[in-house]
Amino acid sequence: MSEVKLTAETRTEFGKGAARRIRRDNKVPGVLYGHGSDPLHLTLPGHELLLALRTSNVLIALDIDGKTNELAIPKSVQRDPIKGFLEHVDLQLVKRGETVSVEIPVQAEGELAPGGFLLEYVLDALPVEAEATHIPQQVTVSVAGLEAGASIHAKDIALPSGVKLDVDGDTVVLQVLSAQAEEAPAEGEGEGEGAAEA
């Protein structure tokens, strides 16, 4: 798991106007919370934070005002829906050795059996519990040779040592569908529309 060091400043200005001023300076407003402490409102460096968030479940080592060092993981990231820049981030305070609940991305590898099958992600991220400094970046699942009707459940996924499922083991994560079955309703709808027009 990667750890990124960021310098943060506490902030005392709040509201939309203050947030706009912070973003204009290429910084991002954020909140650090957890362990029963009061939320701490922060200003974080925009570019460095953006680079850090490219890694899922990144561990962030915060140097706050040059006085306090804390570890955190991102819990909620708000982006501008059009331009994509960071608007706000919520960080969860963590301690080394502490177990946290997170979602790790699921990555399928391998080729499905020949015959025009589609792979559907029922869950694109798997809820797990892991030690805060050892959160996997992703889990990889082999789908090689699977045919329509096959599914992979949460309990079928091999997890790294120290990582436990935080979801029912019978939860379907991936399933294989027949491409022809997916196309059939579309053709039927087209015929119905043609009949209606006639």
UniProtKB/Swiss-Prot annotation:
GO cellular component annotations of the record: cytosolic large ribosomal subunit
InterPro entries xrefs: Rbsml_bL25/Gln-tRNA_synth_N (IPR020056), Ribosomal_bL25/Gln-tRNA_synth (IPR011035), Ribosomal_bL25_b-dom (IPR020057), Ribosomal_bL25_C (IPR037121), Ribosomal_bL25_long (IPR001021), Ribosomal_L25_dom (IPR029751), Ribosomal_uL5_bac-type (IPR020930)
Pfam families per the UniProt record, alphabetical: Ribosomal_L25p (PF01386), Ribosomal_TL5_C (PF14693)
Key words, A-Z: Ribonucleoprotein, Ribosomal protein, RNA-binding, rRNA-binding
Entry's Gene Ontology molecular function annotations: 5S rRNA binding; structural constituent of ribosome
Origin superkingdom: Bacteria
One GO BP annotation of this record: translation
Purpose: This is one of the proteins that binds to the 5S RNA in the ribosome where it forms part of the central protuberance.
Subunit-level organization: Part of the 50S ribosomal subunit; part of the 5S rRNA/L5/L18/L25 subcomplex. Contacts the 5S rRNA. Binds to the 5S rRNA independently of L5 and L18.
Family, as annotated: Belongs to the bacterial ribosomal protein bL25 family. CTC subfamily.
NCBIfam families: bL25_bact_ctc, PRK05618.2-1
PANTHER family (alphabetical): RIBOSOMAL PROTEIN L25/GLN-TRNA SYNTHETASE, ANTI-CODON-BINDING DOMAIN-CONTAINING PROTEIN, RIBOSOMAL PROTEIN L25_GLN-TRNA SYNTHETASE, ANTI-CODON-BINDING DOMAIN-CONTAINING PROTEIN
Name the UniProt record assigns to this protein: Large ribosomal subunit protein bL25
Organism the protein comes from: Streptomyces coelicolor (strain ATCC BAA-471 / A3(2) / M145)
